[in-house]
Amino acid sequence: MTTQFSVAGVELELLRYPTQQESNLQAWDAADEHLLKSLIESEQAAVPTAIINDSFGALSCGLSKLHPSWPLFVETDARTSFLGTEQNHGRNQLPMDNLQWFTSRDTLPENLALVLMKLPKNLSYFAHQLTRLSQVLPASTRVLVAAKSKSINSALLDIFAKHLGPASASLAWKNTRVITCVSDGKPRPLAKEVTWAIPEYQLEISNLSNVFAANKLDIGARIMLENLPKGDFKSIVDLGCGNGVLGLRTAQLFPEADIHFIDDSEMAVASAKANWARNQLPTDKGHFYWDDCMTHLPDDVQPDLVLCNPPFHQGEAITDHIAWQMFLDARRRLKEGGILHIVGNRHLAYHVKLQRLFKNCTTVASNGKFVILQAQKK
């Protein structure tokens, strides 16, 4: 794993979060390098700057290294990004008092003179971010967005024009480009919330823009709902909850149980919380955590059932470490006799991991693409 970041005289040691000693993934990419290199070569002044979608703090650490008092307004939807940025500032002995933190639902300040962004995979979420910027940025404010060259096309530039202002792309460097957008000073309204029904379970669901499977029930969740375990469950964790549909259904099936919703995405947790209220479930039975798996779950929460549909992406990276951490956390936090009940793509071979961790694994259901697996803590 490469940890030494070096661009235009800026030297840093950067780690992903959580740290993975055996991983070949690094905490930054060439788009981070390109964006920081462009700023240094243009001798950018230390003006109030928003940094958006900075995976593990490469951009904020780089600017703090250049000017320790650079006023930075860091926006992220991912708890691991927040924790990783903190970790890397500490590792490089950089100040933190020049940073202010924002989620993707918070309103950024109106005194911004520059915005730096990484292009997210989810373009609906990106459009939401640009729309929010249109509501606070004065005309002529520069927004610099770094991305892989293959991700940049006329359709993407049209998204800029529709939601913020005209944009153009730089020349390529290490297969990346930096898009420069100039705010036109015209505030745009946020997209209206869309609510959709799952009639067979008498549920109404809505998703914020960065939540997986917007406006429909994804196939993995559907097969999971059709194969939920039976038992006398009192404490249930919906781990990686997304919009919360699994936890909502278990609240219907086990009305005496406390349901704990956990996700790395703040928008996911907010969506689950809104859906809990929308479906008029008991306010004292739903609990919501923006967290890196179960790292900071209160000590008194000892679930007897953990439901999990693990992601196998972290940003642009394809990785199984999130699933591995979810399974480890489940084994650590489950009561004796408690159950981990998961859904996954067949090709991911999660049964091997569960057998290794729990010394048991049962196939509950499967189809051509997905498999439901269950392991018990003994």
UniProtKB/Swiss-Prot annotation:
Predominant localisation class: cytoplasm
Gene Ontology MF annotations: 23S rRNA (guanine(1835)-N(2))-methyltransferase activity; nucleic acid binding
Enzyme class (EC, first level): transferase
EC annotation from Swiss-Prot or TrEMBL: 2.1.1.174
GO cellular component, one term: cytoplasm
Function: Specifically methylates the guanine in position 1835 (m2G1835) of 23S rRNA.
Name of the protein described by the UniProt record: Ribosomal RNA large subunit methyltransferase G
Species, as recorded: Shewanella sp. (strain W3-18-1)
Source organism phylogeny: Bacteria, Pseudomonadati, Pseudomonadota, Gammaproteobacteria, Alteromonadales
